[in-house]
């Protein structure tokens, strides 16, 4: 069972180097790395050359846009399982071995998702369900993020490309939720995806340093996808009330930067949901 790992990257060198080190430490060796390099210079060439003899690396050049870069990578896959690591995540040494074993033992399932944690093993990159179970359109927001998703090749062959209007660098207001949109489409096509919270990938929690414009952009992406996939209003209201509650709590406790974060999240979700020209 071979893995195709699609790494879209721009602006990072040391993070990419550390990720490559984590790949080199994998106990399971049947994988290829497809690097979609969106830099305008050769900053990655030396470190890619350093690992080229350790495992297969395919270095592609492409313009900006996370979804566009991943779609370019999808054209080159040859593996049985496809994943989308972030350029600042780290794989634990036994990760691919664990995922390969799970797919071998669960031939009736088409995808596996895990959880994001910091290097101190605390949750990062959002809220996560504690219990394992099937992914559905309602819990998908708490059961997967791009770099914790593993899909059989059949899924990507059926679902197709990421929506290039969504995601960081898309040049649109919708700066997130491209992977959630992808999973919802996969579920709609009848594929079965499972969430295992013990499957963890290390990723820094950068919430405090994210710009408020980026926060709004992330919120707009979520709002856009909630509307596109016709979620019921009670569900939409839940995801509007959460940041509103965060605003109130942060104001009471005097955490004004946190208050601003939650407020901009709320504004973004509202603007994304009520955007003109919404597609369903």
Model-derived features: positions:
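N-proximal low-complexity "stem/linker" segments adjacent to membrane-targeting elements
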Residues: 1-25
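Cell-envelope/extracellular polymer assembly enzymes that use nucleotide-activated donors
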Residues: 2-4, 32, 181
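Acidic donor-binding segment of Leloir-type glycosyltransferases
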Residues: 20-60
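Glycine-rich, basic loop-to-helix element that forms the pyrophosphate-binding segment
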Residues: 61-77
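Short aromatic/hydrophobic "clamp" motif used to bind/position activated sugar donors
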Residues: 82
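Conserved donor NDP-sugar-binding/catalytic core segment of glycosyltransferases
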Residues: 94-127
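A short, conserved alpha-helix in the catalytic core of glycosyltransferases
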Residues: 146-151, 155-159, 166-199
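Non-catalytic, C-terminal membrane-associated alpha-helical segments of glycosyltransferases
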Residues: 213-221, 227-280
């Amino acid at each position: 069972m071979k893995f195709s790992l699609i790494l879209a990257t721009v602006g990072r060198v040391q993070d990419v180097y550390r990720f490559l080190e984590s790949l080199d430490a994998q106990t399971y060796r049947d994988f290829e790395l497809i690097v979609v390099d969106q830099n305008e210079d050769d900053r990655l060439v030396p470190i890619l050359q350093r690992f080229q003899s350790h495992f297969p690396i395919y270095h592609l050049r492409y313009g900006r846009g996370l979804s566009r870069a991943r779609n370019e990578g999808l054209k080159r896959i040859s593996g049985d399982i496809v994943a989308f690591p972030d350029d600042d995540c780290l794989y634990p040494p036994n990760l691919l071995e664990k995922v390969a074993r799970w797919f071998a033992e669960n031939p009736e399932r088409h995808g596996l998702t895990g959880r994001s944690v910091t290097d101190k093993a605390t949750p990062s990159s959002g809220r996560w369900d504690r219990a394992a179970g099937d992914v559905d359109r309602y819990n998908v927001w708490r059961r997967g993020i791009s770099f914790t998703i593993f899909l059989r090749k059949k899924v990507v062959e059926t679902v197709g490309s990421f929506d290039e209007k969504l995601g960081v660098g898309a040049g649109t207001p919708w700066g997130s939720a491209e992977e959630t949109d992808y999973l919802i489409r996969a579920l709609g096509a009848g594929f079965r995806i499972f969430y295992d919270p013990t499957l963890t990938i290390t990723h820094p929690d950068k919430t405090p340093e994210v710009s408020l414009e980026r926060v709004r952009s992330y919120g707009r992406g979520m709002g856009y996808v909630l509307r596109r996939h016709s979620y019921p209003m009670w569900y939409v209201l839940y995801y509007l009330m959460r940041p509103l509650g965060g605003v109130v709590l942060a104001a009471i406790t005097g955490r004004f930067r946190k208050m601003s974060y939650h407020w901009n999240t709320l504004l973004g979700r509202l603007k994304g949901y009520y955007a003109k020209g919404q597609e369903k």
